[in-house]
């Protein structure tokens, strides 16, 4: 399915029903009092997260949503029917912004919990409400108020425990395929991944975490170059970042320079991302079969980056070192979630 992570829509809550102007007219009761009923409230609009959705594609085709109006009141003190509420299903992780003001209205991350986005209009009052000792036959009513209308910008941020970042062709898609049931597209050219892919990594029957394959970044991504600009935001929700580096690039580029380019993009986009746990994953060790040469390459990269955190050497395509990496990730994620509890 095509991944769509932004959409613009308009929502309009229902208008409240008008109050009724009516008087009781029955045989032998020539001067019956007022009996105009109130209108019904307009329907409100709610957003609710659904685990069955993973894209905002539907909002590209349906851009306007309107809840039902409340019905007007009737004689005999009959209240108008309330307008039905409209509940709009969105993927887990959807951020709802007011498109006109930029205000964040809701961060919808819990499935099954409706979040009010547009309040329905208040019902109008019938003339019965205005009866008093000095006004036995009021002809005053009030109309229902209009419902809230908003222009919204929806933004979907991937909810994942682990985010993979690295240059195109660093082997991120291969890694996520190797450790999960994800069917990420893999080919020998840049930008194979055109949208964030999620994979569930199961380390035991009862323990798992979600890994996000963020599209490859290039220098200038923070300013919109390549595919990185619109996907860097997905890293903000992860617990830990895996910096995947091709240890033996076919184009002869310097892995240290490549890694520094990615770190520079993170710093420019959001320096807070550098405060997250970041582990170095040196991929494609199978391309350096000589053990001495491989170890020298690994140490030169670690020294060149002045890397202080954990380092893992793996071959995603041969699943070497991936199990150790997944167990370490699961342990870290468990510890982080326990500390937050």
UniProtKB/Swiss-Prot annotation:
Residues 129-144 have a biased composition (Polar residues). It comes from Legionella pneumophila subsp. pneumophila (strain Philadelphia 1 / ATCC 33152 / DSM 7513). Residues 1-159 form the Obg domain. An essential GTPase which binds GTP, GDP and possibly (p)ppGpp with moderate affinity, with high nucleotide exchange rates and a fairly low GTP hydrolysis rate. Plays a role in control of the cell cycle, stress response, ribosome biogenesis and in those bacteria that undergo differentiation, in morphogenesis control. This is GTPase Obg. It is found in: Cytoplasm. Residues 128-150 are annotated as: Disordered. Residues 160-334 form the OBG-type G domain. The gene is obg.
């Amino acid at each position: 399915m095509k991944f769509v992570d932004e959409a613009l829509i308009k929502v309009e809550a229902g208008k409240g029903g008008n109050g009724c102007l009516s008087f009781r007219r029955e045989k032998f009761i020539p001067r019956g009092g007022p009996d105009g009923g109130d209108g019904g409230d307009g329907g409100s609009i709610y957003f609710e997260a659904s685990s069955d959705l993973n894209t905002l594609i539907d909002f590209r085709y349906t851009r306007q949503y309107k809840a039902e109006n409340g019905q007007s009141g009737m004689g005999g003190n009959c209240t108008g029917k309330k307008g039905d509420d409209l509940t709009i299903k969105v993927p887990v992780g959807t951020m709802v912004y007011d498109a006109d003001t930029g205000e964040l209205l809701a961060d919808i991350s819990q499935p099954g919990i409706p979040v009010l986005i547009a309040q329905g209009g208040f019902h109008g009052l019938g003339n019965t409400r205005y009866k008093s000792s000095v006004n036995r036959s009021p002809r005053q009513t009030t109309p229902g108020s209009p419902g809230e209308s908003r222009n919204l910008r929806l933004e979907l941020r991937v909810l994942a425990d682990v985010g993979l970042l690295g240059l195109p062709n660093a082997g991120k898609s291969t890694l996520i395929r190797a450790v999960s049931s994800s069917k990420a597209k893999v080919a020998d050219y840049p930008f194979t991944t055109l949208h964030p892919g999620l994979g569930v990594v199961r380390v035991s029957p009862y323990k798992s975490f979600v890994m996000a394959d963020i599209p490859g970044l290039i220098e200038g991504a923070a300013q919109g170059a390549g595919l990185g600009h619109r996907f860097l935001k997905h890293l903000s929700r992860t617990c830990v970042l895996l910096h995947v580096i091709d240890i033996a690039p076919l184009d002869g580029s310097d892995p240290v320079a490549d890694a520094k380019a990615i770190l520079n993009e993170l710093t420019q986009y959001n320096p807070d991302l550098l405060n997250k746990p970041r582990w170095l994953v040196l991929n494609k060790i199978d391309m350096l079969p000589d053990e001495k040469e491989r170890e020298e390459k690994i140490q030169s990269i670690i020294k060149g980056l002045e890397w202080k955190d954990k380092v893992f050497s793996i071959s995603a395509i041969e699943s070497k070192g991936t199990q150790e990496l997944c167990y370490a990730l699961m342990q870290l994620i468990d510890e982080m979630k326990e500390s937050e509890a």
